[in-house]
């Protein structure tokens, strides 16, 4: 009964995070679209209100609570599920990954890739508004971790285990590593459509997408495997929050 109650609390948390994060995403998303994308949406009759509603359903229900429920079941089956609790090493690893990832996003991204691409450079000239900050915390920190780590990474571990280690007493560490790498690459690839909606996709931006998101994904996957999905969520969310706050300070100076 305790386990069921714990799962329901987690699923409720994911649902609320997805609904609020989806709402905030729908609010700021139109401002990031290219003129061509906005014209396509207008031609299809997609209003701002409809966009907000669709992002709420998408992140709250489809990508959120549905995948979270499946992910909990699978992660328990492959022994990846860990109840959230204080872990000194987990806190230290999460803090380190969060700060490093945040600094890579800002000012790192602007200083490196911003020199070669005006679109990247311009992303850091405007301070993020409250909807974008909340979206980074909840959609990035919670929903993306549900999708890519709790669900996808766990599913990959299960599939590989069934195919190659059906009679093994326990899942080899290499299976978790492979699943983490594949899910990180897919996590990076999942950001390509969003980039294409905002600007022209160039080889440089493609490399940047896989370098940043793939690298971050590996780190979040490590936290998930070692300390549980809660620590992966915290690291992902904090990376967005810290980089956003640094950007606000830098722009206001």
Enumerate the language-model features and the residues they cover.
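Residue-level signature of transmembrane alpha-helical entry/exit and packing/kink sites
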Residues: 7-14, 52, 56, 60, ...
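Alpha-helical transmembrane segments and their helix-start/interface "positive-inside/aromatic belt" motifs
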Residues: 1-16, 53, 85-99, 230-234
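Juxtamembrane helix-loop-helix connectors linking adjacent transmembrane helices
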Residues: 42, 78-143, 157-168
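Hydrophobic alpha-helical transmembrane segments
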Residues: 50-65, 135-148
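Transmembrane helix-loop-helix hairpins at the membrane interface
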Residues: 131-253
């Amino acid at each position: 009964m305790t386990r069921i109650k714990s799962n329901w609390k987690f699923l409720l948390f994911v649902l609320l995070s997805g609904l609020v994060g989806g709402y905030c995403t729908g609010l700021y998303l139109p401002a990031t679209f290219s003129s061509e994308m906005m014209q396509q949406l207008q031609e299809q009759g997609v209003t701002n209100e409809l966009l907000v509603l669709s992002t709420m359903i998408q992140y709250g229900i489809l990508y959120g609570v549905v995948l979270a429920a499946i992910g909990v079941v699978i992660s328990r089956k492959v022994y990846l599920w860990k109840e959230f609790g204080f872990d000194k090493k987990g806190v230290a690893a999460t803090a380190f990954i969060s700060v490093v990832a945040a600094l890579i996003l800002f000012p790192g991204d602007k200083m490196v890739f911003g020199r070669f691409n005006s679109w990247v450079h311009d992303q850091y000239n405007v301070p993020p508004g409250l909807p974008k900050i909340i979206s980074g915390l909840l959609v990035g920190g919670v929903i993306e971790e549900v999708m890519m780590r709790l669900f996808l990474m766990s599913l990959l571990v299960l599939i590989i285990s069934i195919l190659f280690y059906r009679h093994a007493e326990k899942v080899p560490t290499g299976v978790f590593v492979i699943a983490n790498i594949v899910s990180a690459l897919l996590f990076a690839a999942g950001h390509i459509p969003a980039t294409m909606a905002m600007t022209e996709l160039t080889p440089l931006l493609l490399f940047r997408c896989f370098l940043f998101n793939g690298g971050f994904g590996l780190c979040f996957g490590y936290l998930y495997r070692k300390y549980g999905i809660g620590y992966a969520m915290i690291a992902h969310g904090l990376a967005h929050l810290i980089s956003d706050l640094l950007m606000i300070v830098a722009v206001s100076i």
